[in-house]
Amino acid sequence: MANESLKAKLEAYEAACAKSYAKTPERVGLKHNKVYTPLDIEGFDYERDLGIPGEYPYTRGVQPTMYRGRLWTMRMYAGFATAEESNKRYRYLIENGGSGLSCAFDLPTQIGYDSDDKMAIGEIGKVGVAIDTLKDMEILFDHIDLGKVSTSMTINAPASVLLAMYIAVAEKQGVPADQLRGTIQNDILKEYAARGTYIFPVKPSMRLITNIFEYCSKNVPKWNTISISGYHIREAGSTAAQEIAFTIADGIAYIEAALKAGMKIDDFAGRLSFFWNAHNNVLEEVAKFRASRRLWATILKERFHAQNPKSMKLRFHTQTAGSMLTAQQPNNNIVRVALQTAAAVMGGTQSLHTNSRDEALALPTTESVTIALRTQQIVAYESGLADVVDPLGGSYYVEAMTNAIEAEAKEYIRKIDEMGGAVEAIDKGWLLYTSPSP
């Protein structure tokens, strides 16, 4: 009876407001209701759909206390033309409160060319640091204790080479490999789907990735062996649901490759991590982050029969959306980044890079990157968003959007499974990056 009464009131409300609503067009993305009520989450079961923070299905977060126990890592992505310049920026960020490093490499490094190769002409040091030798890597981390800082390296096709260099530099510093903390992106499938910086065909590339899984599980156990990346997929034009669907489909492919190579699910799954994009639609993004955790946990438990809770936890890094920055009126980008930061924090990110206001124009100035870092610090210490775990949990709108994004993502994953998985979807051209026409 209560539901019937609510339905009647809602119908009357919508009829009364129809003319006003018609003046405001729908925004892109999933279809939104004008107002949300308990009717939008009928069948909702708290323990099944949400649970306690830090417990399966991890909708509310992968840690029981989330930011009340420890804030997210403030990991600013940076890379200048030379190792010396990049080292200077890394040290500046650490001195100003950055709690992790994130290395950007130039395109020749990303696709395995030395700077003196003719194929590298015109691209050396343009979008990141050029690393050709072990000496370059030593300079990059000069006066930075690799035993005390965690480092993320955005490197894919030659990930094994850059990781080997990093381990060698740490050994020279006296830091054993089993004490190193950090992440290599190492996500080659999204290169075929969204970026195009690959070296080898898909299947040989998958072998390199599973070799890294196995090596690190035995020798660098604190290292995150992959950052399965939806960020680039979103930047290439996907929706929120497609971002998590295509990325989780890639994650399934990596797991299947590792299992086929003889590894056991709980020996490596706990070190798989993800990388999401934060766009401007704050509440939709929060719902996306929550849906991704629940979907991954369900897949690991029901499809791959993981036993260790760590294997089911989707831990993720977030970067604010580069595609949302404008070259015109760049100071407005500060506000955009602040909104995206709030979305990432309310969505439960483990680490965060905030873009600088001028990145649509050039590498960020020192002043701009300081503002970007301070944005995180203000949200962390002054907004109150870090005081409550999953502050939007229970919202009719957020729970309904979480369900809708998860359902749409599941449908895409089903389609990819029918093709034989992400590798086959790429080989068939269904999930494949094509360069935009000039």
Report each predicted region and the residues it spans.
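Residue-level signature of catalytic and energy-coupling elements of molecular machines
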Residues: 133, 375, 394
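Phosphate/diphosphate-binding loops
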Residues: 203-212, 330-333, 408-427
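Often metal-dependent polyanion-binding catalytic scaffolds in large enzymes
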Residues: 1-8, 106-109, 390-399, 403, ...
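Hydrophobic alpha-helix feature that most strongly marks membrane-spanning transmembrane helices
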Residues: 217, 259, 277, 291-305, ...
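Glycine-rich anion/phosphate-binding loop at the beta-strand->alpha-helix junction
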Residues: 248-251, 284-372
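Conserved small/polar residues in nucleotide/adenosyl-binding loops
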Residues: 433-438
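Catalytic alpha/beta active-site cores
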Residues: 2-279, 284-285, 303-306, 310-317, ...
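Short beta-alpha connecting loops at secondary-structure transitions
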Residues: 122-126, 192-199, 235-237, 276-281, ...
